[in-house]
Amino acid sequence: MKLNPTVSALVIAAGMTMPTVMFGAAADLDSCCTPADKDQPKVGANLANQSYSSLNQISKANLNALGAAWMTRVSPVPATTPGPSAGTTDTGQQTTPVVVDGVIYLDTPNGGVIAVDGATGVAKWKWTPTVANTGFAPTGTRRGVSVGDGKVFTLAGGQRVVALDKNTGAQVWVSQPTGPAGASLGNIAKVATVYYDGMIYLGGNDGNRNAAFAVRSSDGALVWSFYGGAAPGVVVTDVNGVTIDAGATWGPLQANGLSCALTAGVSPWIHPSVDPELGMVYYTFGNVRSCGSSQDGSGRPGDNLWGNSVVAFDLKTGAYKWHFQSIRHDHWDMDNVHPPVLADVNIGGQSKKALYYGSKSAMTFVLDRTNGKSLLGVVEKARPLDSRQQSATTQKFPAQGMWFPECVVWEPLGTGNIPGSPWRGVPNYDGYQPNAVGQLVYTEPNYLDVDKPFVTYPAEYGSTHRLGCMYDDHWDLPVLSTTSQNGGPDWSNHGFSPRTNLYYVPYGINNVAHDRTEGGNGLRPIGQYQTGGVVAINASTNQVVWRNHFGLDVAHGQHPLITSSDLLFIGMPDGNFIAMDAVDGKELWRFQTGASISSGAVTYAIGGQQFVAILAAGTGIPYGNSITEGDLLWAFKLGGNFKTASGSSELPTPAPLALRRPVGNTAASALVPPNTVLLARSNGTATATADSTATGAMVPSTLTVPVGTTVTFLNPGPTTFATNPNLKAHCATQFFEGLFNPKLNPGESFQYTFTRAGEYFYNDCTDPRPTGKVVVVGVPQDLPGALQFVPGILSMRPANGVHTNVQGLATAMLKVPVGYTFDGNVQLKTPLSTTLFPAVTATMTSDGATLIATFDKALIDNNMPEGAAVPLVVTANFMNAGVQKQLSSTANVRVVK
């Protein structure tokens, strides 16, 4: 575990005093904005979705004493209800735990529910439905239960809502709610449930038509419902007296006489917020995907209500109150569904009942939650329009702007700028091609020239070609823009602290290329980095106060938890659970849980002691199969001293994440010569599609070679494929290092010798989608006996007795043969992890004979066991005779913990 040294010094000076934890809130919250306390009975902590707790025992002053109290693997726990059954080995879940009266409730990886004693980690009960014992199965992905009225509310297979006795897990009732005349309410499977005052508020996800709806907590009977796609004849009047013909916003009826609204999706797939004082519940509705696709708006002219809108309803009746649409006529699949955050804040010297409506488009609309009007101003911006898309002429932006750049950053290529701006664009998209010095310059002709007759540019856009900006229009060919359907905060909760008056947003960055032929999420260019962080926004001004861009995407369920001691806890896709200073965003504390985290933390108090808990279970978005799934429920407290099998409190570091979008899997064939790549072919056969624009149209997609290999890039002409040659010129534009950029006519080839290990992506200039990768590997040259650690005994004992506070450096010395020049990349391999750990410092002695490297004990202690002869391997790159070599040596070291 890594602790900020300044904080450590403060704590040591303060000693181990343990302040009394303050609490008092009941499980059934009675107001929107009362902070959660010893209980957090719903995802988002309170009815306002603030993800904030008034608990303050764990603070910046004693953070170095925060250690693991216990860890429970929830899947192997046997089920107790509705009938005894064995545990499972399932992993992976997006749920955030909730807690009431010291008991943690959460969805298990296989979709059941478990109750765990918050003090000990011992399971109290576990509910796992099966077709054999209940007549239905669980759902898979779940995002949270809620607790109230003595029950735990969850979802199950077959569009079921289930109530369980919170003390025993016994089924109280099961319902299958339907809409008017038995109509489907959508796919009832993922959305976290919200309980308030005898009602459960729910939403449909992923179906053709989805509704927000409420059922009674006593028996699951439907009380009201409201569909996201407004059918013909739906006319409403809001609290401001404005009448809207919502059904008319979908254009004319189809040839079959039906409205596009009836198959539009428009899912309320994230849990709502509730204001009991105003008697309103606030839902957000997502993207439109009917009459074409989510990337094609040509068949549904109009604003398409209630797509990408926040809508306020009467709590009891579901009567429409007001709405605010963030994106008109969405054909980018921006899917602005986020839990609305409510707060009472001072704006312009007056107390306002605010609603914060954030978005994947990286902007926050600050609204008056009594009437839906903007509190800080909205501007309408004209965007480039493709006449075929039936686009809205303007789109809404907060007057304060976005918290991301509005356009893609077209940074120059070069080895000195890796990885570069988080918002940098992959070359060749939108016509931005590298010039002779690697600058990305808009160049004609390019693949988007065919759109010119249909695209118009408003004067305020400042260009007559696409810049890669928010809401740039598209048609059949990919147009790269920011942000992304998988960027912004995606489904992560936001947070709010009344102490700091900051609104917190965990985000991801993943530029996306839109065209009508892409799937729902568009095309995230292969090879671009997938990163993210947390941004804090002044709740009174909507201005960014700080940003911590820590390089990992936290847009996918990694909800922040803020406490009244001004700490912000958040889980990471690499398994780390971190604490940040909520005032300035600095990281203060870090713990390795052993599995990817796609969940929010929860805090609670038992017997006057504060705990923080997190589920490390994992999800594949956006890092795919490189993530490590799990089923690990962790709890932390001051003085926690839980230890794993290695003798450390942390689990070993999971396998490294694939931070760049992966290439396809097109393999070579017998017709492809060794160390050769064929450009723009669907595969390596003579009958392949020539001049292919598929993403996998570099053959092979991945070519792995040793350092020093010369690779040939060939645009196959008649000599290679006599009856089916490529007819167009094609490029191999290497990015982001900019090592080469040949443009080859059919039959031409280019060679490049790779002298250093690494991953080298490249794509085509004729159409930017075909992308490949050359993986250059160093062949380790073993140096027996050349490595030693100083001193010979490696102590991993923490100074304060709490094992999460291991600090200091481990020093290694590697003897180097004559004629080798140091070339960097010093790494340590440990027995318990496949991750290689970088050196903190690495220097050569003045005679060039010895490499001295140091490694952070906080990163490596959990990745090695105790023992008298623990094998540790150091590798480093050196140049010899103009070729990079990887030297490696092993030392058996005594490790004590």
Predicted regions and their residues:
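Repeat-blade elements of multi-bladed beta-propeller folds
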Residues: 37-44, 88-112, 136-161, 185-212, ...
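Blade-level signature of beta-propeller repeat domains, shared across WD40, Kelch, NHL, RCC1
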Residues: 602-657
